[in-house]
């Protein structure tokens, strides 16, 4: 019987997600033995610089993907929001389990929500998307970059200058911490999530049919549809960590997909939103992206500083 080697970052969240996937596969009847291989990525090593300055989304996956290409590991579990819109040749997303909470979560030092933050309060986030939309909601706030895994950011909230921090709700919930520490969940109407937020992407080699069949045991087609829509939108925008961009898709009763796309300026002064519904998720993402770009998005992208 083949042993399946699963690549994972070594953070608590990454390991929790990887172990969850393995457990789901076992519960679905997978007859394999599994072994987790920890892989340190560039994004894990560089913690004192904003993501966009050191390479953006691919920082957390390149080393893992190379080990997959080299056949040192068989598949890897990622937070989909960390995956670039284009994958290396020969690799595919083999499965997307059901999406969990896509919202952003605010954690404050006082336990109060967004409205309770005093004027000029400092909120930590490494996401230009979150910063832009937060400043739209509260122009008086000050945004400061904060890096590191969940534990590190929570510690910085206690010891640093921050009055609050913004994190993905999904990660906190997967760690089992959300009920104790989340001050407010920000509605997706007020803050469009990152593309793929709340979705696990299980990446594997396209030519490894055995692993593809295995991963299909926990694949959710509705989640795949919204992921297609959001990722095709991101690819058309050419979005990265350099761009305040977000996209959130939902499935309707008639199985059509509705996508809301967001593109904004770093200071939150310009916020562009487009909404469309289609039966074709891939085309939907491209349509929403084109409309955003035509509505002033190109000018926003051109005006973004190079040193973000």
Swiss-Prot record:
SUPFAM superfamilies listed in its UniProt record: Periplasmic binding protein-like II, Porphobilinogen deaminase (hydroxymethylbilane synthase), C-terminal domain
The protein's Enzyme Commission number: 2.5.1.61
EC class of the enzyme, as a word: transferase
Pathway: Porphyrin-containing compound metabolism; protoporphyrin-IX biosynthesis; coproporphyrinogen-III from 5-aminolevulinate: step 2/4
One biological process term in Gene Ontology: protoporphyrinogen IX biosynthetic process
Residue numbers of S-(dipyrrolylmethanemethyl)cysteine PTMs: 241
Catalytic activity annotation: 4 porphobilinogen + H2O = hydroxymethylbilane + 4 NH4(+)
Keyword annotations: Porphyrin biosynthesis, Transferase
Co-factor binding details: Binds 1 dipyrromethane group covalently.
Top-level taxon: Bacteria
Molecular-function GO term, any one: hydroxymethylbilane synthase activity
Cofactors, names only: dipyrromethane
CDD domains linked: PBP2_EcHMBS_like
Keyword hit for Membrane: no
Single GO cellular component term: cytoplasm
HAMAP family per the UniProt record, alphabetical: Porphobil_deam
Family of this protein: Belongs to the HMBS family.
Subunit annotation: Monomer.
UniProt-listed PANTHER family: PORPHOBILINOGEN DEAMINASE
Further remark: The porphobilinogen subunits are added to the dipyrromethane group.
Functional summary from the UniProt entry: Tetrapolymerization of the monopyrrole PBG into the hydroxymethylbilane pre-uroporphyrinogen in several discrete steps.
Protein name, UniProt field: Porphobilinogen deaminase
